[in-house]
From Swiss-Prot:
<keyword id="KW-0963">Cytoplasm</keyword>
<keyword id="KW-0067">ATP-binding</keyword>
<feature type="binding site">
    <location>
        <begin position="12"/>
        <end position="20"/>
    </location>
    <ligand>
        <name>ATP</name>
    </ligand>
</feature>
<dbReference type="GO" id="GO:0036431">
    <property type="term" value="F:dCMP kinase activity"/>
</dbReference>
<dbReference type="GO" id="GO:0036430">
    <property type="term" value="F:CMP kinase activity"/>
</dbReference>
<keyword id="KW-0808">Transferase</keyword>
<dbReference type="GO" id="GO:0005524">
    <property type="term" value="F:ATP binding"/>
</dbReference>
<dbReference type="InterPro" id="IPR027417">
    <property type="entry name" value="P-loop_NTPase"/>
</dbReference>
<dbReference type="Pfam" id="PF02224">
    <property type="entry name" value="Cytidylate_kin"/>
</dbReference>
<dbReference type="GO" id="GO:0006220">
    <property type="term" value="P:pyrimidine nucleotide metabolic process"/>
</dbReference>
<keyword id="KW-0547">Nucleotide-binding</keyword>
<dbReference type="InterPro" id="IPR011994">
    <property type="entry name" value="Cytidylate_kinase_dom"/>
</dbReference>
<protein>
    <recommendedName>
        <fullName>Cytidylate kinase</fullName>
        <ecNumber>2.7.4.25</ecNumber>
    </recommendedName>
</protein>
<dbReference type="InterPro" id="IPR003136">
    <property type="entry name" value="Cytidylate_kin"/>
</dbReference>
<keyword id="KW-0418">Kinase</keyword>
<comment type="similarity">
    <text>Belongs to the cytidylate kinase family. Type 1 subfamily.</text>
</comment>
<dbReference type="GO" id="GO:0005737">
    <property type="term" value="C:cytoplasm"/>
</dbReference>
Amino acid sequence: MTDLSPVLTIDGPSGAGKGTVSRIVAARLGWHYLDSGALYRAVGVAASWADLDVSDPAALVRCTFDTRVEFDDAGEAGLRVLVNGADATSELRLETTGALASAIAAIPEVRSALKERQRAFRRAPGLVADGRDMGTVIFPDAAYKVFLTASAEERAGRRHKQLMEKGVSVIFDDLLREIMARDARDAQRVVAPLRPAEDAVLIDTSGMGIEDVVQRVVGLLADRAPL
């Protein structure tokens, strides 16, 4: 039987703040949380561990089916991710893993293989789904849809600050180029290109604090229908 629990989709490009906002909103609502990007990154980590060639789609599709991904949700504190039983949380957030995940996500067979795995997260009392095609492909019937965005410069600045605070030395211009390249890949791929759902509420997070965005999203849910 299809689960009809309510779903809030939060889509947007890398660095728009959707991951942090989604986790906090899910925790405050008491809903489940899906980080769809973590699934693709997990496959990327598994492919890296297996030393697979990113230009070999067949091998990556097999890797997708063979990879076991488990989420340990820590609420607002974040998400612990196990790949085939091993903790891969820190590796998932590396820039190299993100680039690999973006390339893998462009393979139609990989997206198809992960589609039902993502939909299985939908259960009572509700789900906050964070990604790039949550409102357009995975949960097109979601009652609540949000698309977060921000300028490439703003997003590169946020990522630069995060990495510097972690002691990781990185050049801002390099990050900006990577973000712009990823935006182009995500927008131009044939299957599930990055775009807002027609019924999504667009929020430009440039210059906004996380709490401001969270309150805006929670307010949208309260305005549209009782939870």
